[in-house]
A protein has these predicted regions:
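Core catalytic region of metal-dependent phosphoesterases/phosphodiesterases
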Residues: 2-102
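Glycine-rich phosphate-binding loop signature in dinucleotide/nucleotide-binding domains
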Residues: 22-26, 52, 112-113, 147-150, ...
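Short, well-ordered alpha-helix to beta-strand connector turns
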Residues: 26, 52-53, 104, 151, ...
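Hydrophobic/aromatic beta-strand patches that form the interior of the parallel beta-sheet core
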Residues: 30, 56-58, 118, 155, ...
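Active-site-proximal segments of metal-dependent phosphoesterases and phosphodiesterases across multiple
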Residues: 76-80, 114-149
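Conserved beta-sheet core of the metallophosphoesterase superfamily
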Residues: 134-198
């Protein structure tokens, strides 16, 4: 089985389509949110995900921000010098697109390859990371319940920084990075994603 793990598309349909072509034989696609904002193709990205099968998707902070700005209507009358990517994205999205994002969960759980997985866009309200087994257990139990006693992996996006962090036997968290936009201090300009095989 092959699981494709991605995050932080930010309305970049070219990057998304490139990854989907390269990894077309995936069995399950997991996306840790941020489908919108900063890019030019929010509707196309939303439509692509609607067409895909076998997905586990959660919303990200930028998706929530786009929803809030869209529903407030403030994107329809933006003062000079205040126009941002969020307004650009709102202009290109329909009520149907917004409804699709609104139905995405904040967190999701699934099982694959003998592991239990929890997926969310971000670990905390900032750019924090899971630093200890205790913090991992606290987060897992609060988010997914304490009854899982086997191998567990958490998937986060948000930071645009790719990593795999092993806290001990059967306890890992991963961040695929962003398929679209790297942080300015990251010399690696390649798209970030992970492929899990078993």
């Amino acid at each position: 089985m092959k699981v494709l793990v991605i995050s932080d598309i930010h309305a970049n349909i070219r990057a998304l389509d490139t990854i989907l072509r390269e990894e077309a034989d995936y069995d399950l696609l997991c996306c840790a949110g941020d489908f919108t904002d900063y890019g030019i193709s929010p509707r196309e990205v939303r439509e692509r995900f609607r067409q895909l099968k076998n997905t586990v998707l959660v919303y990200g902070n930028h998706d929530r921000h786009v929803i809030n700005i869209y529903e407030s209507g403030e994107w329809t009358n933006v003062a000079d010098g205040k126009y941002k990517w969020v307004h650009y994205n709102c202009e290109r999205l329909s009520e149907k697109d917004i409804d699709w994002m609104k139905q995405l969960p904040e967190k999701a759980y699934f099982e694959a390859d003998g592991w239990s997985y929890g997926i969310a866009h971000q670990y905390d309200n900032g750019y924090g990371t899971v630093e200890s087994r205790y913090a991992f257990d606290q987060y897992w139990n609060a988010s997914y319940g304490a009854e899982c006693d086997g191998k567990r992996r958490l998937i986060f996006g948000h930071t645009h920084r790719q990593c795999i962090h092993t806290l001990g036997e059967g306890m890992e968290w991963i961040n695929p990075g962003s398929i679209s936009y790297r942080r300015p201090d990251d010399a690696n300009r390649a798209a970030g994603f992970y492929v899990l095989f078993w």
